[in-house]
């Protein structure tokens, strides 16, 4: 064991992990190679998808409260996707962290920042729609884009605050076989005289706090908000959910499915300090459910598209319309704006991946890529039925 490992106080479960040897089974190596390929593809998809969502929603659409929520969700997912290539590298070099202690802390902090930010933002979206339906007059007077951005900044600050313990206790630990772990070491700060008790109490506190704050409480807020909205809409005789409601439901379901198993294994890991029999199960399952949580950031942009009606029938035509409407000179938008705005299917409706919900128009000649690049984010915001549909969250 290296000097680095012997000088650091370690919890019993961490000491046992440091003594585990690397595997030499051929079938397991094939699984590792497949995992590297899968994570590499997921990181590429996540970066591209969330980058497109950020650009389209932030630069090519009229800013509303709803687009503000989507913008910050995509930013959180982009951060998580940006950290995924480094996790892929960790897998590729044989499950050994070769990027140093500081980057180990930063990489893990991004994972937990995304976890808290996603839960907080989904809660805010649900409360926003609840206020729109239950307190429409108040929402009309106070629900603004500036207020939504301020709420998001507060939620980001809370997410950063909750991430601090995971930054502090993350560390690199050398294994007997020469590999390096990037993992919790809850004895880094003030271990105390009874190390076993300190390990158990701190690990339980971390697992329970993130389960409550990043998962259970957000889901409770989302469920109660949905129940309040459903009751109010039933009194109004409106039963069919709007497009944005279906989008939120899909994103929340993906959040629960991707993050739920991680929290279960995190709680099992905390229990494994006192119950060594759980440790093999945790060591086998925790890497898998951690990857599943990462993939939530890749799934969300896809859900923005798949929640639209008649997606399979319109997918091919709609994607072509999306590209042709975005790759167009700004002067063409201005010159033909008056006639094109009168059309039911305007280019503004197809200015984002969410435009699969709209009816695509026929192509209008070759795309003007250079003009679009020169226009970029400086183009004037486009308005149209898509933005009106996104803004009408209670429809």
From Swiss-Prot:
Cytoplasmic side: 57-67, 128-146, 232-247, 309-395
CDD domains: 7tmA_PD2R2_CRTH2
BP-aspect Gene Ontology terms: adenylate cyclase-inhibiting G protein-coupled receptor signaling pathway; calcium-mediated signaling; cellular response to prostaglandin D stimulus; chemotaxis; G protein-coupled receptor signaling pathway; immune response; negative regulation of male germ cell proliferation; neuropeptide signaling pathway
Entry PTM: Phosphorylated.
UniProt-listed PROSITE patterns: G_PROTEIN_RECEP_F1_1 (PS00237), G_PROTEIN_RECEP_F1_2 (PS50262)
Tissue occurrence: Widespread expression. High expression in stomach, small intestine, heart and thymus. Intermediate expression in colon, spinal cord and peripheral blood and low expression in brain, skeletal muscle and spleen. Expressed also on Th2- and Tc2- type cells, eosinophils and basophils.
TM stretches of this protein: 34-56, 68-89, 107-127, 147-168, 211-231, 248-269, 289-308
Keywords assigned: Cell membrane, Disulfide bond, G-protein coupled receptor, Glycoprotein, Membrane, Phosphoprotein, Receptor, Transducer, Transmembrane, Transmembrane helix
Chain residue ranges for the region called Disordered: 333-363
Cellular compartments annotated: Cell membrane
One term of GO molecular function: prostaglandin F receptor activity
Alphabetical list of PANTHER family matching this protein: CHEMOTACTIC RECEPTOR, G-PROTEIN COUPLED RECEPTORS FAMILY 1 PROFILE DOMAIN-CONTAINING PROTEIN-RELATED
Family statement: Belongs to the G-protein coupled receptor 1 family.
Function comment: Receptor for prostaglandin D2 (PGD2). Coupled to the G(i)-protein. Receptor activation may result in pertussis toxin-sensitive decreases in cAMP levels and Ca(2+) mobilization. PI3K signaling is also implicated in mediating PTGDR2 effects. PGD2 induced receptor internalization. CRTH2 internalization can be regulated by diverse kinases such as, PKC, PKA, GRK2, GPRK5/GRK5 and GRK6. Receptor activation is responsible, at least in part, in immune regulation and allergic/inflammation responses.
Entry protein name: Prostaglandin D2 receptor 2
UniProt organism field: Homo sapiens (Human)
């Amino acid at each position: 064991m290296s000097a680095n490992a012997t000088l650091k106080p370690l919890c019993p479960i961490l000491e046992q992990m440091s003594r585990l040897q690397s595997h030499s089974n051929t079938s397991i190596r094939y699984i590792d190679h497949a995992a590297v390929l899968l994570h590499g593809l997921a990181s590429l998809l996540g970066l591209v998808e969330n980058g497109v969502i950020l650009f389209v929603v932030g630069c090519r659409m009229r800013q509303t409260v709803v687009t503000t929520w989507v913008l910050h969700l995509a930013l959180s997912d982009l951060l998580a996707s940006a950290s995924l290539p480094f996790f892929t590298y960790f897998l590729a070099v044989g499950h050994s962290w070769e990027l140093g202690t500081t980057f180990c802390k930063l990489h893990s902090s991004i994972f937990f920042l995304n976890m808290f930010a996603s839960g907080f933002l989904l809660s805010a979206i649900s409360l926003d729609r609840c206020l729109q339906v239950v307190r429409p007059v108040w929402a009309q007077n106070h629900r603004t884009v500036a207020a939504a951005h301020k709420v998001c900044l507060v939620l980001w600050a809370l997410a950063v605050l909750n991430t601090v313990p995971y930054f502090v206790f993350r560390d690199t630990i050398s294994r007997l076989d020469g590999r390096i772990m990037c993992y919790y070491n809850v004895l880094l700060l003030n271990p105390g005289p009874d190390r076993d008790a300190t390990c158990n109490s701190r690990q339980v506190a971390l697992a329970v706090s993130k389960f409550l704050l990043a998962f259970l409480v957000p889901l409770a807020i989302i469920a109660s908000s949905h129940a309040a909205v459903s009751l109010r809409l039933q009194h109004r005789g409106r039963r069919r959910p709007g497009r944005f409601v279906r989008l939120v439901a899909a994103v929340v379901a993906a959040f629960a499915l991707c993050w739920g198993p991680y929290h279960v294994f995190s709680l099992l890991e905390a229990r494994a300090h006192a119950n060594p029999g759980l440790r093999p199960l945790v060591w086998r399952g925790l890497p898998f459910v951690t990857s599943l949580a990462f993939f939530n950031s890749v799934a969300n942009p896809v859900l923005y598209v798949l929640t639209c009606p008649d997606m399979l029938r319109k997918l091919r035509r709609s994607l072509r319309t999306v590209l042709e409407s975005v790759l167009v000179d700004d002067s063409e938008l201005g010159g033909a704006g008056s006639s094109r705005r009168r059309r039911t299917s305007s280019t503004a409706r197809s200015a984002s991946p969410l435009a699969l919900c709209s009816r695509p128009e026929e192509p209008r000649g070759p795309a003007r890529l250079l003009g679009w690049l020169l226009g970029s984010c400086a183009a004037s915001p486009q308005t149209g039925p898509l933005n009106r549909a996104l803004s009408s969250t209670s429809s």
